[in-house]
Amino acid sequence: LWERLGQDLTLQDLMQQCRFEVLATTKLPMAIDFLNSELKHTGVLAPGMRRLSHYFTAYQAFLVEQAEEDRGRFDFRTALLVLQSEANYKASSAFDRQGLFFFQFEALCRHRLKYDAGLKSMSQDPAYDVAWQEWLLIVQKQLGLVDLADLIYGRSEEFVTYRKRHLGPDARPEYPILFGEREGKIAFANRRKEPLYLFAAMQRHLGYPPVPKREIVDQTLELIPQMQRRLERLEARMKFMEEEQRQGIDITKFFGRGGPPMVDLGENT
């Protein structure tokens, strides 16, 4: 769908084409028909995706909903790229919950989406277990009051080692541990810093796919043809002005090959 957005076709027509190209042995064509009907009646896809919860997660529906907002800067093409990268990562052998969390949360940060609704939709993703879902709701409430790196460090093996070193070997974590020792060290090193540095370090360490960014169209290649057309119009206007100052404008050259049109003045009887 993303590859065909630039073919000057409506989204309804593209959905109809995709419906005939998927495997007929599955029920996916029925889901595409349902989304196409929702698109024709309401003009948006997100409500239909929420109703098809067995095909789309709440986070995926949230991304499409943000892309369909009129005042948002998150365009639909970028949303499809994010959905594609997330689906490929979930299907790969390198998938883990830590990488999925950083990928989804980095998408919220880079595209300036709503953190509250975004984290809530992340907590409803079936890829996370109960411990992850509870922690995501905690992050939703504490984000902005507590640094993200501190929230990650508090659920890491590095923090458990720190507690045992200062409180004794019998010190046990009070909450489920979600991150390893290396992730805790990276989070501790990036405290009070720009979150993008934390994401870059985690992306290199965990190997999750980079978050697609908004494509910036280079308009410099279109400037020269535009300037050329403007110069041609200015040149034509200058010629008209010169002819008018000399002897008037000769309008006969604008006539067709048949000569000037004949005007029937009629006769008074």
Locate each region found by the language model.
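Catalytic metal-binding core of the metallo-beta-lactamase
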Residues: 1-269
